[in-house]
UniProtKB/Swiss-Prot annotation:
Main function: Involved in the regulation of the intracellular balance of NAD and NADP, and is a key enzyme in the biosynthesis of NADP. Catalyzes specifically the phosphorylation on 2'-hydroxyl of the adenosine moiety of NAD to yield NADP.
Name of the top EC class for this enzyme: transferase
Matching PANTHER family: NAD KINASE
The encoding gene: nadK
Gene Ontology molecular-function annotations: ATP binding; metal ion binding; NAD binding; NAD+ kinase activity
NCBIfam families listed in its UniProt record: PRK02155.1 (NF002561)
Keyword NADP in annotation: yes
UniProt name for this protein: NAD kinase
Length: 300
C-alpha cells in the first residue's frame, strides 16, 4: 500500500454479461496490486470472468473488508452495487464501460492513468442520496427496497391509465390519472425523470422530484420537494400497476396499496478525479453547446 493512501483493500466490480471485460479488469487489478494494494473481486464478477487469483467476496463482505470499490461498467452496474454497499459507506469509483455514463465518470481509456492517482489520495469526494420505499397492503408492510435513481409507479403496456392519490407529509397533493409517477433523487433526475420532461437537479441539492408519466391533465407538472419529505402514493384505480426501483427490481401492486417513499438514512460516497465538474458531465452527455451543421440542413 502506498504510504500516503487511506486505502488498503480495493474491490473490483464488473458489468455482468459483457464480453471481453475480463481482460481489462484483470489488467487493472494487476496494476493496482503492483502499487501495494490488496485486491478482491465481487463474487459474481469473479465467477463470470473466471478469476481465482484474488479473493471473491459477496457485496456484504466487500462492505466489511474493502476500503473502496472500483466499478467497471455502466450506470446500471453502479446503481446495483451502490444500493448493496450503501449500509457500509464504501466509497465508489466509476469507470465507464457502458453507454451514457452519468455516474461512471472516468473514461475507460484513461483508467490506467487516473485510478493510481485517486488511490494515492488525489480525488474529490461527494455524497449521493438514496430513497427507501415501503409498500403497504391492508395496513401491513409487504415489501421494502432502496433506490439510487428513482421509485417508479406505472401501468403495464397493455392496460389503461392508473389513478394515483399522492400525499406529501400526510397532506393531500392531488389525484392523478396518468401512466404513472416517478419519484427521483437528484442523481435520478437525469434518468427516466429527464425523459419524462422533469428538471435536472444538481446532486448536492437537497430535494426530490415528482414527475408524472404522460398525465391526462396537462396541468399535472413535475414538482421539486424537500428531500426530508415523505411521499405516499395510493393506487385508486387501474389494472396491472407495478412499482420498480431503479428499473432493476419490481413488484406488482393491488388496488388501495400505498407506496411510501422517503430519503434513506444511507448515502453513497462517490470519488471523482480532481477537477471533476458536474456541469461538464451534463454538457458532454447531453450534447450542450453542439449545433447542427448547415451542411446537414437540406433546406438551407
Amino acid at each position: 500500500m502506498q504510504a500516503n493512501s487511506q486505502f488498503k483493500t480495493v474491490a473490483l466490480v464488473g458489468r455482468s454479461n459483457t464480453p471481453g471485460i475480463g481482460e481489462p479488469l484483470t489488467a487493472l487489478a494487476t496494476c493496482i496490486e503492483k502499487l501495494g494494494f490488496e485486491i478482491a473481486f465481487e463474487a459474481e464478477t469473479a465467477q463470470e470472468i473466471g478469476v481465482s487469483r484474488w479473493p471473491a467476496l459477496q457485496p456484504a463482505e466487500i462492505g466489511a473488508r474493502a476500503d473502496v470499490a472500483i466499478v467497471l461498467g455502466g450506470d446500471g452496474t453502479m446503481l446495483g452495487i451502490g444500493r448493496q454497499l450503501a449500509p457500509y459507506k464504501t466509497p465508489l469509483i466509476g469507470i465507464n464501460h457502458g453507454r451514457l455514463g452519468f455516474i461512471t465518470d472516468i473514461p475507460f481509456s484513461d483508467m490506467r492513468e487516473i485510478i493510481p492517482q485517486m488511490l494515492s489520495g488525489s480525488f474529490e469526494r461527494e455524497e449521493r442520496s438514496l430513497l427507501e420505499s415501503r409498500i403497504m397492503r391492508d395496513g401491513q408492510p409487504i415489501y421494502h427496497a432502496l433506490a439510487f435513481n428513482d421509485v417508479v409507479v406505472n401501468r403495464s403496456g397493455f392496460s389503461g391509465m392508473a389513478e394515483l392519490r399522492v400525499s406529501v407529509d400526510g397532506r393531500f397533493m392531488y389525484n392523478q390519472r396518468s401512466d404513472g409517477l416517478i419519484v427521483a433523487t437528484p442523481t435520478g433526475s437525469t434518468a427516466y425523470a429527464l425523459s419524462s420532461q422533469g428538471p435536472i437537479l444538481h446532486p448536492q441539492l437537497q430535494g426530490l422530484v415528482l414527475v408524472p408519466i404522460a398525465p391526462h391533465a396537462l396541468s399535472n407538472r413535475p414538482i421539486v420537494i424537500p428531500d426530508d419529505s415523505k411521499v405516499s402514493i395510493q393506487i385508486i384505480s387501474g389494472r396491472d400497476v407495478n412499482v420498480n426501483f431503479d428499473m432493476q427490481s419490481f413488484t406488482a401492486l393491488e388496488l388501495n396499496d400505498t407506496i411510501d417513499v422517503r430519503r434513506s438514512r444511507h448515502t453513497v460516497p462517490f470519488l471523482h478525479p480532481v477537477g471533476y465538474s458536474y456541469y461538464a458531465t451534463l454538457r458532454k452527455k447531453l450534447h450542450w453547446n453542439e449545433y447542427p451543421s448547415h451542411e446537414d440542413d437540406p433546406d438551407d
